[in-house]
């Protein structure tokens, strides 16, 4: 394991924190306009798409710095999306439970796949 200068570690923590601040505030804002299951589904699908873009950008292009990917994924996307709210809302709405679980997972996986295709398109048809 390589030694990392303490300022680099502090910078990384600050970047993740700023990403988390932005993601959680956007999550709150989305919830104001789309309360309940709809808002949770929307942020989780958008987050799946965004994470798919980040992962496949790293695999196929590699233009983003590791700090940028960390701030975007661990900071922003992880605070924007919400598995715990998804679980609670599913339990609290038994009439929608199966549809919510199946729909959330199907759309989440679709979001990742669309993210992959967007990267392929912009990367010039890479792998």
From Swiss-Prot:
One of its GO terms (biological process) is cellular detoxification of fluoride. It comes from the Archaea. One of its GO terms (cellular component) is plasma membrane. The chain crosses the membrane at residues 6-26, 29-49, 95-115. Fluoride-specific ion channel. Important for reducing fluoride concentration in the cell, thus reducing its toxicity. It comes from Haloarcula marismortui (strain ATCC 43049 / DSM 3752 / JCM 8966 / VKM B-1809) (Halobacterium marismortui). InterPro entries: FluC. The gene is fluC1. It catalyses: fluoride(in) = fluoride(out). Keywords: Cell membrane, Ion channel, Ion transport, Membrane, Transmembrane, Transmembrane helix, Transport. Pfam families: CRCB. Its main location: membrane. GO terms for molecular function: fluoride channel activity. This is Fluoride-specific ion channel FluC 1. It is a multi-pass membrane protein.
């Amino acid at each position: 394991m390589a030694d990392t200068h303490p300022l680099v570690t502090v910078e990384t923590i600050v970047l993740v924190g700023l990403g988390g601040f932005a993601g959680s505030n956007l999550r709150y804002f989305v919830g104001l306009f789309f309360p309940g299951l709809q808002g949770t589904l929307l942020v989780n699908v958008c987050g799946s798409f965004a994470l798919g873009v980040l992962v496949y950008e790293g695999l196929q292009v590699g233009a983003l710095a590791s700090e940028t990917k960390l701030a975007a994924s661990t900071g922003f996307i992880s605070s924007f999306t919400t598995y715990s709210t998804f679980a609670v809302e599913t339990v609290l709405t038994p009439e929608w439970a199966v549809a919510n679980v199946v729909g959330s997972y199907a759309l989440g996986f679709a979001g990742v796949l669309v993210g992959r295709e967007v990267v392929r398109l912009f990367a010039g048809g890479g792998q």
